[in-house]
Amino acid sequence: MTSWNTLLSPIMRIEPLRRQSLVTLFTTLALTAVGFLSTMYFAHAVGESVLGAYFLFLAYFNTLNLIFDGGLGGAIVKRISEGREIDEHFTAAFVMRILLVGISIILIIFARPILENIDRSGVSSWLFIALIIGIFWSSVSNGNYGSGKVGLNQTCGFINSASCVVFQVIAVYLGYGVNGLAGGFIFGMIAATIIGFRFLDLRIKRFNAGHLKSIFSYSFWIFLASSGSLVFSYADTIIIGYFLKTADVGIYRVLFQFTTAATFTTTAMSTVLFPKVSSWNANGELEMAENAFSKGVTYSLLLAVPVFVGGVLLGDKMLYFFYGESFAQGAKTFYVLLVVQLVNVFMFLQTMYLNALNRPKESFKVTAVAAAANIVLDFMLIPVIGIIGAAIATLITMTMNSFLAYLALRRIISLKLEFQGIRNILIASIIMGLGVRCYRVLVPLSNIWLTLIPIMFGAILYIFLLLKLDTNIRDELIQIGKQIGFQ
């Protein structure tokens, strides 16, 4: 115990918001790395068709899970973060989740003909099991997250993903294919639920109709807004699976996952900020939320911009060597998706802010318009030009969503950007891009090792330039170092 205290005490000396941001950042980075490496292995071990079947399983799971959740997850995080009658609200949401299990059983039985493509993949039974386990995992995760245990929640998320990947790698190696992938997904949720429950402070307590009304008044709009977000995440996957081959699903989802490297800082910032912004709003401290927004955008672009530049310059070779020749054929789609992730920085933060500021209705309105347009464009473009049509549809409608969210959010708080910080990020990224471009002109990228060199060189050059140009980021690192104990 003493050794653990010695190890953790420097970290605990860091100011809480910084500490939670760092824990979230590093766990998200670790999750991203684990996800990328495992997907690379699966791409070579089982190919794009098996991966496509697994991605369809995930698409249906997340779609059905949203329906069965009904917005309860977001609502309970919101109500618990406000700090009023938290046990009663948690219990009310948990009981509703249990009741929805019965509804899920009935819906899946009647929906078997609709789920024909996933039935052919042999993972329909895994889907049913995953939905049941997901209810308990979501309850524990949302309970800890709403209680402000952001670092713990991220750690459990890491355990979920890491356990999932370890199980999947072993199962794929033993030849279980898509069943091993689906089984690993469920195993990860079980492991994270057990550990997260150990630290859950919330308890089952009698609730009344008032608590249900409080949850549903918020969950209804969260459900509708989440439905819109889900369209951006999985509608294209399901539509590609309907019009094209399962292999095309595998290629598209791998490309999409690869580009999400640009937004892991956005995910980290949003995860940390949501309960904070919710609390600031409840206490009338909107100025704190305004300052955090400008910082959130800057720190989100910190990675998104250089990843975009590097992806455009090296994307075709990275896809070829990391995943295989069939995935490299989607390079043009990959470039479009890189732009999508830049837009996603603003859309993600702005819609998160609308929900945290107790404006789920506004969040739904802006997302619903874009989501409807996304489905229409998917049906128009995917049958004609393939997976690049899905990427173009996502780019157009996500830009629309971001703009509409901006118009709604600026009526609530004052939106400011740190133009100096953004300028420094752009300058460092451009110079990095020139350096990487010169390397590619001079050195043929004939193998994976020659491809990794410009990636590492570009990263080092970018970090050096950014720390040289931006005193705020440099001072932030120095401050964290002092709080840890480095002088």
Residue ranges with predicted function:
Residues 4, 13-73, 101-109, 130, ...:
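Signature of the first transmembrane helix
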Residues 79-94, 251-359, 363:
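Specific pore-lining/lateral-gate transmembrane helices of multi-pass inner-membrane transport
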Residues 63, 67, 98, 102-106, ...:
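Alpha-helical transmembrane segments of multi-pass membrane proteins
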Residues 20, 24-31, 57-116, 121-125, ...:
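Membrane-water interface segments that mark the loop-to-transmembrane alpha-helix transition
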Residues 2-10, 437-487:
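Membrane-proximal transmembrane or re-entrant/amphipathic helices at the cytosolic face
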Residues 36-50, 230-262, 279-280, 316-326, ...:
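Helix-terminus/linker motif at the lipid-water interface of multi-pass membrane proteins
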Residues 4-13, 175-185, 194-233, 276, ...:
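Interhelical loop/hinge segments that connect adjacent transmembrane helices in multipass membrane
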